[in-house]
């Protein structure tokens, strides 16, 4: 089932837990902003997913509005795109139940993220965490998305989404568009500064692990200085030297310079020089975002009104999809 817009539709979701960091920005948000002319974008703050792990209620509310404000500051333009909060639209949870009843236990049991997250939080293994992929599928399918930007860690969930959509269409009748993955090549995997073997994460514990979009210049400089490298001295793009490679890739993305010119720039120079140059580039690149957020965050009612208006404009699509699915399975 397709939609009537001439532009292809993209659904993107981001959780309001933790703080948004450089990996989120370079791997996802920056591409979202750049794609607004080419695609019809639906950006969703997926706060219902966040409560699969126990949250402080007030903190969750605050982080939800903070994330929305940061996305606006990064350049999400609600005249061109939709930006709303998942829990504003009841059809997400309602469709997830219908999908739950049409996903075999075996398929859900194979989801590696459930195993990873339950191992990290053994005292908080709940049904919501297990059913997380069904809600994610509902998020996507509600809006008849053509594409979903996904990292490597979410590809399995999108495959499940595609499988359940195709199975539903076959068993009940045409209802869902089958979404395709959109995997950005550049900046898709920004690694942790303190552990370049693992992806930069909002939930990592180390204070020097990630650079957050609202970090001050002093904090950014400190984190860059403490970034893990190696004992060699030449500065070249070499994937086997994970720490150095990560820093160079971040520098490459922000400066838009070629790898050859970057290697020439740092020829004969030490890691300290690279780290300071990287810190300066990050600080200057984040400055307009931080300045914009400082203005936006002063007016919470503005953020709320933007989110409400966007939710109201997108709700008919969700309602139409849900009502169709509901009718097809025989619910009244």
UniProtKB/Swiss-Prot annotation:
Its EC number is 6.1.1.2. InterPro entries: aa-tRNA-synth_I_CS (IPR001412), aa-tRNA-synth_Ic (IPR002305), Rossmann-like_a/b/a_fold (IPR014729), Trp-tRNA-ligase (IPR002306), Trp-tRNA-ligase_bac-type (IPR024109), Trp-tRNA_synthetase (IPR050203). A motif ('KMSKS' region) lies at residues 199-203. It comes from the Bacteria. GO terms for biological process: tryptophanyl-tRNA aminoacylation. L-tryptophan binds at residue 139. Pfam families: tRNA-synt_1b. GO terms for cellular component: cytosol. One of its GO terms (molecular function) is ATP binding. Gene3D superfamilies: HUPs, Tyrosyl-Transfer RNA Synthetase. It catalyses: tRNA(Trp) + L-tryptophan + ATP = L-tryptophyl-tRNA(Trp) + AMP + diphosphate + H(+). A motif ('HIGH' region) lies at residues 16-24. ATP binds at residues 15-17, 23-24, 151-153, 190, 199-203. Catalyzes the attachment of tryptophan to tRNA(Trp). Homodimer. NCBIfam families: trpS. This is Tryptophan--tRNA ligase. It comes from Helicobacter hepaticus (strain ATCC 51449 / 3B1). The lineage of its organism: Bacteria, Pseudomonadati, Campylobacterota, Epsilonproteobacteria, Campylobacterales.
């Amino acid at each position: 089932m397709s939609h009537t817009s001439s532009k292809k539709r993209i659904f993107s979701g981001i959780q309001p837990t933790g703080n948004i960091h450089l990996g989120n920005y370079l791997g996802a948000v920056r591409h979202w902003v750049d794609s607004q002319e080419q695609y019809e974008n639906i950006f969703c703050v997926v706060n219902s997913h966040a409560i699969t792990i126990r949250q402080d209620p007030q903190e969750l509310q605050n982080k939800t509005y903070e994330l929305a404000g940061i996305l606006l500051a990064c350049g999400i333009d609600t005249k061109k795109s939709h930006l709303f909060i998942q829990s504003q639209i009841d059809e997400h949870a309602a469709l997830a139940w219908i999908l739950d009843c049409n996903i075999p236990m075996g398929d859900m049991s194979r989801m590696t993220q459930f195993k990873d997250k339950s191992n990290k939080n053994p005292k908080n293994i709940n049904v919501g965490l297990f059913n997380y992929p069904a809600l994610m599928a509902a998020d996507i399918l509600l809006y008849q998305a053509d594409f979903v930007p996904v990292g490597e860690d979410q590809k399995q969930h999108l495959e499940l989404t595609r499988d359940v959509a195709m199975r539903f269409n076959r068993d009940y009748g045409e209802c869902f568009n089958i979404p395709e993955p959109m995997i950005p090549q550049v900046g898709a995997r920004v690694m942790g500064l303190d552990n370049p073997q693992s992806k930069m994460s909002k939930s990592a514990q180390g204070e020097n692990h990630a650079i957050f979009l609202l970090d001050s210049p002093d904090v950014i400089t400190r984190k860059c200085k403490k970034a893990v490298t190696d004992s060699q001295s030449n500065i070249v793009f070499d994937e086997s030297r994970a720490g150095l490679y990560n820093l160079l890739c971040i520098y490459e993305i922000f400066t838009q310079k070629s790898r050859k010119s970057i290697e020439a720039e740092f020829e004969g120079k030490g890691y300290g020089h690279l780290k300071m140059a990287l810190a300066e580039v990050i600080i200057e690149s984040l400055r307009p975002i931080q300045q914009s957020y400082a203005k936006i965050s002063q007016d919470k009612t503005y953020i709320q009104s933007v989110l409400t208006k966007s939710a109201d404009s997108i709700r008919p699509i969700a309602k139409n999809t849900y009502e169709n699915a509901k009718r097809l399975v025989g619910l009244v």
